[in-house]
Each structure stands twice: as structure tokens, then as C-alpha cells.
Design a protein with these regions (language model features):
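N-terminal helical cap/lid subdomain that shapes the substrate entry/recognition surface
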Residues: 2-95, 99-104, 117-120
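Residue-level marker of regulatory loop/turn positions in helix-turn-helix DNA-binding domains and
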Residues: 90, 111, 144
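Ser/Thr-glycine-rich phosphate-binding loops at phosphate-binding pockets of nucleotides
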Residues: 2-3, 112, 176
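Asp-based, Mg2+/Mn2+-dependent phosphohydrolase catalytic module
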Residues: 95-103, 115-255
Length: 255
């Protein structure tokens, strides 16, 4: 939803499948609700949604517990590994933006809620398309994933950059924006290409203009409410934000 997989489709599709296997259908909105978290935490948070808990109790005669979450996470891993490459196309504009940032001496760090074995598939597919971040940190590499700041701060260490207030966190999820804020970084929310709208590129492009504007406005409002310093549609539009951040840093401003 940030650099690849327009609409953040890969995990959402698999979460729906996992709950179907457990006999409790969930909606795509329910599958997306905790997006950005470590995937086991994500499954647990879905089981905490009141409507899902009610369906689960109706089906199984009890509420979901830790063993259910463990079992669904065990189902999730192979399903996700099997389909990742189907959703690995880079989001338009990614390569040009990364080239420009690197020409300005900016290092590129990546964070993800995927496990390391899943991330290796994404990194391989991204590299084949010409994109390779300088550092990648998974939720499984640190004590806790989003919205905690640990993945961002591990990237700071890996990249040996300082000060933190000169770093920028770009994300398509609310927990990802919170992650950046908690790390003390500037934040740029991507409202259209990721989880907030949750549509593949072709489906987004096919929407009537009025529907696009309604959905876009809702996503922008949610990201601003989460505290994002800037919100744009996709990665292709974020370079002016960096120009503004540099101006604000020169004035002594901090996130």
C-alpha cells in the first residue's frame, strides 16, 4: 500500500480465507480494521471486534481464545507465502521517487507487519522491479510492531542517521502513522494507494469521480485525525512534502 500492492490486497484476502476456514466469515472491512500490526496481533484484534465475537460464539458456542488465534495464525502463514507474489507490483511512481530521494542523499528504510520469510519474498520481487530499500525491519525483528516505534527506530540504527526529527515516516495505515509519530518523526499518510481505501488500482481508476472524491476525503480525514503531518494520494505525490519538511527544519521546527 506504500511502495507495492496498490490497495494493500494481499493480507486482507488471506485474513478473510483464514476466518472462513475457522467457520466464521468476516467482511473485508473487518479483515482490514487492524491493518499495519504484526499479523498474529492482527488476527487477535479481528477476534476482538464485537460482531466477529458474536458470530464466533454463535458458530462455536464460545468466544475465541488464544489457541484459536494461534491456529489461525498457523493457517495464515502458508496462505500468505503462497500468494504474496500475486500482489507484488510496485505502485506507480515508486521508482522515480526513490531515485530522486537517493539523489538528495536520503536513505530509505522500510518497515512491515509481515514476518521475515514473507518480507524476503517482497524484497525479491521489489528488487526485480528495480526497488531495493537500504534497510528493512519486520515486526518479528523487534519487541512489538506498530503503533510502537521500534521498527522505525531500528531503521534509524541500521541506517546510522541522526537526528530522528530529520526522519520521515511514510505509511498507508493509521497504525503506521502512529508508529512514525511515536518515533518522533515527520509523517506522510498515503490515503489512496493503501488500506484506507483498499481497492486495487484498476478498481480505483474505474470508480466515478464523485465516488473517488467521497472515499478520498474520508481517508484524508482519518489520516489527519491520526496526526499525519501531510496526506497525499500515493507515493508519486509526496516529494513536495519533503521540500516543505526541509524548509521547516531549517526554521528550527520539529515534528
Amino acid at each position: 500500500g506504500t511502495t507495492m500492492d496498490f490497495g494493500c490486497m494481499a493480507p486482507a484476502v488471506v485474513f478473510v480465507k483464514v476466518f472462513e476456514r475457522a467457520g466464521v466469515p468476516i467482511t473485508m472491512d473487518e479483515a482490514r480494521a487492524p491493518m499495519g500490526a504484526h499479523k498474529r496481533v492482527h488476527i487477535q484484534k479481528i477476534t476482538e471486534i464485537p460482531a466477529v465475537r458474536a458470530r464466533w460464539e454463535s458458530k462455536h458456542g464460545r468466544l475465541p481464545g488464544e489457541k484459536d488465534v494461534d491456529r489461525m495464525f498457523a493457517d495464515f502463514v502458508p496462505l500468505q507465502l503462497a500468494c504474496l507474489s500475486e500482489y507484488s507490483a510496485l505502485i506507480p511512481g515508486t521508482l522515480d521517487v526513490m531515485k530522486t530521494l537517493r539523489a538528495r542523499g536520503i536513505k530509505i528504510g522500510s518497515t512491515t507487519g509481515y514476518l521475515r520469510e514473507m518480507t524476503e519474498i517482497n524484497l525479491r520481487d521489489a528488487k526485480r522491479q528495480g526497488y531495493e530499500p537500504d534497510s528493512t525491519v519486520c515486526a518479528s525483528d523487534v519487541p512489538a510492531g506498530r503503533p510502537y516505534p521500534y521498527m522505525c527506530l531500528q531503521n534509524v540504527i541500521n541506517l546510522q542517521v541522526s537526528p530522528v526529527e530529520a526522519c520521515v515516516k511514510v505509511d498507508d495505515t493509521i497504525p503506521g502513522i502512529e508508529e512514525g509519530l511515536n518515533a518522533g518523526m515527520w509523517t506522510i499518510g498515503l490515503a489512496v494507494s493503501g488500506d484506507e481505501i483498499g481497492l486495487p488500482l484498476k478498481d480505483w481508476q474505474a470508480l466515478p469521480d464523485a465516488e473517488k472524491q467521497t472515499r478520498r476525503q474520508r481517508a484524508y480525514e482519518r489520516m489527519r485525525m491520526a496526526g499525519a503531518n501531510y496526506v497525499v494520494d500515493t507515493i508519486a505525490e509526496m516529494l513536495p512534502c519533503f521540500d516543505d519538511i526541509e524548509t521547516r527544519l531549517a526554521r528550527g521546527e520539529k515534528p
